[in-house]
């Protein structure tokens, strides 16, 4: 995770696995899966195309360290946009962009309006 407080809480709740939680933009080594939960929703710029490129670049940097795949969730609408500092992707466009990494499955996240979970596997 990139948030020190989240890592501290994970280590507190799971002390037997504390060494498995780290702060950083990339996993510290090879992992089975990388999970990005809400990581890319808050956006501090006002250029949705640039933010989407940032997301794909971040995933591209992480992909070589993933043995099996990556999972992420994004808010999705009919148009790629940023509204009130929240990024919204177009599900079909994001699915197509993620195919450069591998097989992509996308599904609405139950109980969360506009939220879509993407699973990318090798």
Segments (PLM) and residue ranges:
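Conserved acidic residues
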Residues: 31-32, 68
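A short SAM/SAH-binding and catalytic strip from SAM-dependent methyltransferases
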Residues: 33-52
């Amino acid at each position: 995770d990139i948030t020190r407080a989240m890592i501290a809480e994970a280590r507190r709740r799971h002390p037997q696995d504390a060494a498995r939680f780290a702060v950083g933009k990339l996993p510290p080594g090879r992992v089975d899966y990388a999970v990005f939960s809400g990581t890319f929703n808050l956006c501090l710029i006002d250029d949705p195309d640039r933010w989407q490129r940032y997301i794909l670049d971040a995933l591209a940097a992480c992909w070589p360290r993933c043995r099996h795949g990556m999972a992420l969730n994004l808010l999705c609408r009919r148009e790629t946009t940023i509204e009130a500092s929240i990024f919204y992707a177009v599900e079909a466009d994001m699915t197509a962009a993620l195919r450069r990494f591998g097989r992509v499955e996308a599904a609405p996240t139950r109980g969360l309006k506009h939220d879509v979970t993407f699973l990318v596997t090798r």
